[in-house]
């Protein structure tokens, strides 16, 4: 094509010149071929040659190119290009097709970019704020309490806020007071309480989260044993069921320790000594704490807080601790339950396989270690107890109990039975009995999950290393069967504590009678301290 022979005047591009020849009835060309034909036809137009020559001259002379002026007028006359050429065959495909690019109002663009919807906030770093009605209701109760205390409340006056406004057990009052008053000014004002309880979104939390946040230390994501000490101190100072202990500080401290150890034994399933919010929610501690405000008889709250249960635990420890140095060794523990345990299982306990001792004295068990032991021994059906004894019997620590490991422990049981002229039982028979009771997934071994899935798991461990309980199981002790039927809701530990407290109380009464106390039978049974 001779560009130099073309007139320099810029002509208006006629859209009709871009029309393709009429289509034959033959099959339609592919879209790419149609585009090539259109482009070739455009290049052959005189106006195109003029435009190209003009752009080349501008480029050689260094003149800035004004693209909008150089474009043919057809591209400036409308914001959209013209329709594609009509086919002579009248094909509906060409009569309907548009080549315009997508615009803001294009339905294609609407499909690709849907309108943004406003999603309401669902995450709140410090908890969901209270609803307007709930907030107003709480403020009304706060105003009612603080109306008589314009300058604020002291700790002994704060209990009404804890119970009426916060709906929490009253013995949490000092802990809540100190949380709002970290600078120890000994007074909590209305504004300070509102800032902590309402503005801090404590109002909308569940009870477990509220108690967890009140008790935990700043910056900690768990509860320690020491965090429960203020709660127990207030309970001992105010609960009518513990009034008799208020003049005996030594046993107040022992009672508080025992309650805390029991809480961590059953609820702190990780065994780390760090109680998480999840563990607190999963346990039954909150229900027991709420019951304390409703029940004056502390012994009716058998979960954690029963004084009778503490009495049994402490007296058992005192009986074994011959030199009363507050430590127990192997020789002491082997006497537990009238020498019921085997030496092999006691060795495993003192090897600290099921749990590391808190005692700093080599070969000695502390009072806390004993609490864990006695709860495991007398409540073998509970999950913490099953985990405790499973670790003891799993000699190689591979997560399964094999027949060889069970035989290792039963050998000593068999020897003890022979020593007391008791009819011996073959281990093969015992093994079949255990398999029938547990129904493990694999018959050649027993897993922890197998034990947790059976109601007879406690009997397995009694067979292996507790002779007295094994014999009671074999003879089907009618007293134990009757006791289980009388109250099926009680745990093994509850029934044990009930029996032992009755026995210990009777022994105490006999001692008083032998010492010349004539009025002992006229007095109700109660602990000596």
Curated annotation (Swiss-Prot):
Gene: B''EPSILON
Organism of this sequence: Arabidopsis thaliana (Mouse-ear cress)
Domain named EF-hand: residues: 381-416
MF terms (GO), sorted A to Z: calcium ion binding
Protein name: Probable serine/threonine protein phosphatase 2A regulatory subunit B''epsilon
Function, in words: Probable regulatory subunit of type 2A protein phosphatase.
Pfam families xref list: EF-hand_13
Keyword Chloroplast tagged: no
Renumbered residue ranges of the record's region Disordered: 60-110, 507-529
Source organism superkingdom: Eukaryota
